[in-house]
Amino acid sequence: MTGLSGDKFDLLVIGGGITGCGVARDAAMRGLRVALFEGDDFASGTSGRSSRLIHGGIRYLERGQLHLVHESIRERQTLLRIAPHLVKPLAFTWPIYRGARVGKLKLGAGLLVYQLMAVGRSRRHFTLNAAETVAREPCLKSAGLTGGAVYYDACTDDALLTVANALSARDNGATVVSHTRVIELLRENGKATGAIVKPQHAGEAYEVRARAIVNATGVWENGFITDERARRRRGSKGVHISVARERVGNRDALTLISPVDGRVMFCLPAGPQAIIGTTDTWTSDSPETVHASVDDVDYLLRSANAYFPRAQLTRDDVMSAWAGIRPLASASVTNPSAVSREHSIITDSSGVINVTGGKLTTYRSMAEEIVDLVQRSLAQKRQRAATDSTELPGADRAKEIARLQRENESLSTPLVEALPYTGAHLVYGVRVEMAQTLSDLLIRRTHLAFETRDHGLSVAHRAAEIVAPLLGWSGETKSDRVREYERDVERMFGIT
């Protein structure tokens, strides 16, 4: 990539999470010359550690955030349309218990508003009596149950959604580079004019020039921000755990109220697993070191066990636990759940456009707003990109992986028994989805690391053998990459 040295782009995007990749896609589709650099892998931070929900945000109604709910519902329907292979409708059951903070009247009113905002955009919600609720979800505690409601949102593969945006940006002419970190901004007369970037594994640092720069690094502290307003951001830690779904027994998604602190939480179906989350606590941890604590795990187990008395989950049931940091526009409040999930966009004195906050669901509209600002800063007439009607790539993914399996039978063997991932998934991840490391493949192009108790460590050597010829790894490099994966697993999935 050193051939980029000295090149001048219209836009430099720093950060390959969902926001950065969405911005790069939108800008490239408008005809701008775009370069995006991500220091690790696409979605390796917050974007790949979400609840994997594309949702209207029904819980935001309680705080009166009607604009955010309306935008989220609109964007949910947009994503269902442009990425049906990645975004799927999902039914949620919300049980109601006697004396609960959210009772029948409050939930009914909320769902009515939710439905009115989504008119013509989703299936209608409906209510249940106690017997119907238990019939729908027999795993639930029946004592004190007075009824329930069913409403519809959507789920996704957060990492693959991010990668799809990166691929779309590249397909529209953007230069999209992962595992290459921006180490310093270039400035002339106080204005940012480019950056010095350095590949993660090999190669010398080089310069990239740009007329506009978007900092989409979220909570990463990188020294790029010079404006005090843009520094007013805080990190909220969100922890999820996964357990065997048969231990819980949920048929669909469940929306619950934690008896510990009254927060809305979810129990979500994920194939043979159930994902339970999430926490919401202020943290000073860095995104590179954030992890689930014993207290986080115990909170989620205690909250879940209040609803699933037959399960009585313990720490031994936890297959995986992981944490991400939500970048929130800072507020002087004790409870991070009270902070709006709406985004903020601030242009600092050097001309860098900094974005903080936002939701996975609303990334596309947020990117559109950011690129509008970029075009104004470049004195360009606003051009509308058809990001809301152009399908994201990847619809042929399953077909292409099946073709690889037919062409090479050795690639059809499951990497782990009872899981769908094969060597063909790894080959496809490298050839098509820009994967470069074992973590890229086992954590994000597949979810094998989330779905095995050893987080894929037992197949790391085999995975390295499969992709080594594609990535040009020598024997020594293969060993280095396996050790790198072991460190990544400990950092991401360790509980302390």
Residue ranges of model-derived segments:
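Core beta-strand elements of the Rossmann-like FAD/NAD(P) dinucleotide-binding domain
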Residues: 7-9, 202-212
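Dinucleotide-binding Rossmann-like beta1-alpha1 core, especially the glycine-rich loop
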Residues: 52-136
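Flavin (primarily FAD) binding-site architecture
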Residues: 215-228
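Beta1/beta-strand and adjacent pyrophosphate-binding region of the FAD-binding site
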Residues: 5-19
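A conserved short coil-to-beta-strand element within the FAD-binding core of flavoproteins
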Residues: 178-193
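Short hydrophobic core segments
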Residues: 14, 208-218
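Glycine-rich FAD pyrophosphate-binding loop
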Residues: 28-49
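C-terminal accessory subdomains/tails of enzymes that are appended
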Residues: 3, 8, 40, 86, ...
